[in-house]
Amino acid sequence: YSEKNKASPNVCIIGGGIGVAPVACFASTLLPNSYDFYASFKSGSYGTKYLRANKLIITTDDGSEGIHGMLPAAINAETIQRAGYKYVYACGPTPMLAYVQKICKEANVKCFISMENRMACGVGACLGCTIRTTEGNKRVCKDGPIFDSDIIIFDEPSGVRRQSLAAEMQPDLSVEIAGVKFNNPVIAASGTFGFGQNYRGLFDVNKLGGICSKGMTLEPRAGNPGQRLVEVTGGLVNSIGLENPGVQHFIDNELPEMLKLKTTSIANLAGSDLESYVKGAELLDKTDVPMIELNISCPNVKAGGMAFGLECTAASTVVSAVRKVTKKPLVVKLSPNAPDVVGVAMACVKAGADGLSLVNTVQAIAIDIENAKPVFANIRAGYCGPAIKPLALRMVYDVVEAMNRLPKEERVPVIGIGGIQNWQDAVEFIMAGANAIEVGTATFSNPNTMIEIIDGLAAFMKRKGYATLEQMRGVAQVNCTQ
């Protein structure tokens, strides 16, 4: 910004959202009443009273301040020409900047925009913040952030702006998975929630869509010896080792209490060999549990567990064997450690799985550097938490993408698991194609996480006009075959 513009009475400054603050700072260097200021917010006016503008025009999405609407409700090319502006300076969301560029071009007025782009290094080395211009790629951190709008190339808008649901309408969060009804898609993940009783003093567990039991094996297990947990960057490494009282004890004691809850119960069944899986399934088949989650993916046990989920033949064998002895809806829990997760998923579907849940924890190791040895007695353990979310999301996306290539009658529902911390994460998994989600590690740091996800999901669906989960499910699948 040159000095000769400092006292110009023909300056228009436009800010949107958090972009108001930078241009407000710029405005403070100009003479009072030498500029007009347009501020666009979702709600409120956020300190604009301190501006010394000739005219202050505010727009708000909710109508709480100024003009009800977005920036186009207050300014267009005709407005710029009529006001006699010679220079326009803008900072805000990319769609707003694209609009400002457009109207300034129509009005034949010089425009400078402050671009924002995600960056890593901030010194021009990583090239993560480059934007497209008529002069080639430019780095926002070093070549900007201020650019002549004439050279900026904005991407064409993607997607459709959706209308919110009517005020009296509430979105339907219910979902049906393999014939089993869930009041909402948020399920407590196996291994993190006990049998549904431990958290009852912290929040109303009946509000959950479902609860998945601890991993049950045919025989009782004491779990792994020694240290079982290590907190690491982005999550936890755990080596619990499927400690559980055994399937029969579960049927006699824990399951009746689970079934009293006003939420859908799922029995997670693990095993050490094919026979134990089959016998465990036979026992569960005689109960009232609505669904079985077949765990072929536990990474921190020496016998069975993940060994059945790493390749197609082994996975198909155990699913087929269990399928023969139970009529219960069978959801197979997959491992992220399989070299070909999609291949294993399709093999499970072909073998009789009614659904898939993915992913379990990522196999990891922690080292005790003081004693120069592995932290865990079992050496390898399971890494869980927010750091694995992008990996889990990719695998869910890939599996759903492959599922969509099957005839409709052969497709099965998918439950997304892995690093889900908030409702935004849940939306990502559902848009990737998941029918429901399971939440685990996040509950340790915030017991109310799942309730917050349910509430946030409902609010998002209402705001974006999704009346049902099915309307939102899979919308991010770009190669979807209907």
Identify the residue ranges that each predicted region occupies.
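Glycine/Thr-rich beta-alpha phosphate-binding loop at enzyme active sites
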Residues: 61-64, 236-237, 244, 298-314, ...
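Glycine-rich phosphate-binding active-site loops on the catalytic face of alpha/beta enzymes
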Residues: 93, 213-218, 296-298, 355-365, ...
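Catalytic cores of alpha/beta
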Residues: 125-128, 197-202, 276-286, 338-351, ...
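Alpha/beta catalytic cores of nucleotide-metabolism and tRNA/nucleoside-modifying enzymes
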Residues: 141, 163-170, 384-411, 421-482
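C-terminal helical cap(s) of enzyme catalytic domains, especially alpha/beta-barrels
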Residues: 146-155, 223-233, 367-380, 443-467
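N-terminal capping/small domains of soluble enzymes
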Residues: 169-265, 270-272
